[in-house]
Amino acid sequence: MADGIDRTAEERMEFTTSKEVTVAPTFEDMHLKENLLRGIYAYGYESPSAVQSRAIVQICKGRDTIAQAQSGTGKTATFSISILQVIDTVLRETQALVLSPTRELATQIQSVVMALGDYMNVQCHACIGGTNVGEDIRKLDHGQHVVSGTPGRVADMIRRRHLRTRHIKMLVLDEADELLNRGFREQIYDVYRYLPPATQVVVVSATLPYDVLDMTTKFMTDPVRILVKRDELTLEGLKQYFIAVEKEEWKFDTLCDLYDTLTITQAVIFCNTRRKVDWLTDKMREANFTVSSMHGEMPQKERDSIMQDFRQGNSRVLISTDVWARGIDVQQVSLVINYDLPSNRENYIHRIGRSGRFGRKGVAINFVTSEDVRILRDIELYYSTQIDEMPMNGTLFYLRYRPMSRLSLWLTQSNSCRPSHVTTLSWSTNVEHTFPLLLMNAFSKIQIGI
């Protein structure tokens, strides 16, 4: 697994794919530029993942493409390699535009493009909000082969005529379900109308609801489809648990007990609102726990600094809103805690996908109040999975506020209350194992913690 992709999971993955799509088993079979191949191998890839082996050739042919695959299967590299194959680095003009829903993701994509194109003298700029407009203008006027950005700032630079669009041949929508949501939809259309009529469109995401797929017909022509079935989206190697917490105010003490008990490499804790992130961060620090936090209202410099510390391992626990749920890779994250269950079921898989990246083992723990039972059941039905109650042992793992009475009993009823087609994706469902023992077995004695 030197290239960071779980090949066992890849082999089991089934694609609902257009009939004309063929599989390229190696990068050499894709007839890529020699300097691009050098960059791919230097980046650590040895052979293409399932989505890469199907999508790269089609994108390089100029076909509009819809690619949906699990988190951590190399989607970013899929379109980055394709972009680097089709651009002309002699021409100092923007030829590919990548739009992302968050600034951090846009910056990460820029890093991937630069790394893969290390031997090609490629220029790629991250055009994102919250940064110095003058720097954007200077970089864009100088000429960039690829621009990775957020819709608002990109649209602004196009309107100001600093981002020249006449040579753009490819538009990539990363995390397309979020971009085509109401919050970004008009901005995407605003950008699209400035592009040349023949611009190729590539749509990429881990989740693509039917209404989003239907919407793509407005700006895509006869697209090639590479789609993973929805019930195969739950991540391989990622164990999902719930903890029944009858009252909202008991969540904090439960979290403190988890923090005291587990040993992890790095963890992300998700809350649904910025106010909750700030409140929980303050409470954890008051209790002498070392945590960092991030949400969309923070200045971009502060967000960049927090991200850098977290990537470098200087910060171990990050509390965040869904701004961190989309596509961001920190390979040492092994635990995700949903302090609040996401109100949008598509966001669930994006959140838990921050753990167990690139085929590593990971754990997702969901705090569930009586008001969240419907949401939990909806997630199980939607992804055809079963989320088990977290095993515990009084001597090894003790919650001071063990609220497992009626709610826990209801949640752990017989499987007759669950859909018959649900399958359990787990390493072990034997509840007599203690949770620390499960982690030890699952991670082969790799510490996962604080």
UniProtKB/Swiss-Prot annotation:
Q: Which GO terms describe its cellular component?
A: nucleolus
Going by the entry's taxonomy, the superkingdom of the source organism is recorded as: Eukaryota
Q: Where in the cell is it found?
A: Nucleus, Nucleolus
Q: Which reaction does it catalyse?
A: ATP + H2O = ADP + phosphate + H(+)
Q: Pfam families under this entry?
A: DEAD (PF00270), Helicase_C (PF00271)
One GO biological process from the UniProt record? rRNA processing
Q: Name one GO molecular function term.
A: ATP binding
Residue positions of motif DEAD box: 174-177
Main EC class the enzyme belongs to: hydrolase
Q: Which residues form the Helicase ATP-binding domain?
A: 56-226
EC no. given is: 3.6.4.13
Keywords, alphabetical: ATP-binding, Helicase, Hydrolase, Nucleotide-binding, Nucleus, Ribosome biogenesis, RNA-binding, rRNA processing
Residue span, Helicase C-terminal domain: 237-398
What does the comment on domains in this protein's record state?
A: The Q motif is unique to and characteristic of the DEAD box family of RNA helicases and controls ATP binding and hydrolysis.
Which purpose does this protein serve, as stated in its record? ATP-dependent RNA helicase involved in 40S ribosomal subunit biogenesis. Required for the processing and cleavage of 35S pre-rRNA at sites A0, A1, and A2, leading to mature 18S rRNA.
Give the matching PANTHER family: ATP-DEPENDENT RNA HELICASE DBP3
Q: What is this protein called?
A: ATP-dependent RNA helicase FAL1
Organism from which the protein derives: Ajellomyces capsulatus (strain NAm1 / WU24) (Darling's disease fungus)
For this protein's source organism, the top of the classification is: Eukaryota, Fungi, Dikarya, Ascomycota, Pezizomycotina
